[in-house]
From Swiss-Prot:
Keyword DNA-binding: no
Subunit structure: Part of the 50S ribosomal subunit. Contacts protein L20.
Family stated for the protein in its record: Belongs to the bacterial ribosomal protein bL21 family.
UniProt keyword terms in alphabetical order: Ribonucleoprotein, Ribosomal protein, RNA-binding, rRNA-binding
Role description: This protein binds to 23S rRNA in the presence of protein L20.
SUPFAM superfamilies per record: L21p-like
Keyword field contains NADP: no
Originating organism: Helicobacter pylori (strain G27)
GO cellular component: cytoplasm; ribonucleoprotein complex; ribosome
Protein name: Large ribosomal subunit protein bL21
Gene name, Swiss-Prot/TrEMBL: rplU
Pfam families (alphabetical): Ribosomal_L21p
InterPro entries hit by this protein: bL21-like (IPR028909), bL21-like_sf (IPR036164), Ribosomal_bL21 (IPR001787), Ribosomal_bL21_CS (IPR018258)
Length: 104
């Protein structure tokens, strides 16, 4: 089983061909092809190769499925005996992609 670890938007993801991953919003149309070139590590046929910081010649090809927004996350702070409270909500914009090919 071959897998790859790549970096996108300040986060690291471990993927296998066929995986569906939620990445930060990329402003791409559905069915568009995306190349992810910041590959940190690749495992092919039992051989693991690490990059310094990225693996030379390695890339991940993915297809955009759709875009969306996550469920709202509520942040609530209350200070006791102060009659002070803060409530904020946050929804992450994401792009859902399917990993089609790992090139090493």
């Amino acid at each position: 089983m071959s897998y790859a670890i790549f970096k996108h938007g300040g986060k690291q993801y471990k993927v296998v061909e066929g995986d569906i991953v939620l990445l930060d919003k990329m402003d791409k149309e559905p069915k568009a092809l995306v190349e992810l070139v910041e590959v940190l590590a690749v495992s092919k046929e039992g051989k693991l190769s690490f990059g310094k910081p990225f693996v030379n010649g390695a890339k991940i090809e993915a297809e955009v499925i759709n875009e969306g927004r996550s469920k709202k996350v509520i942040t609530f702070k209350k200070r006791r005996r102060k009659d002070s409270k803060t409530k904020r909500g946050f929804r992450r914009d994401f792009t859902r992609v399917r990993i089609t090919k790992i090139v090493a």
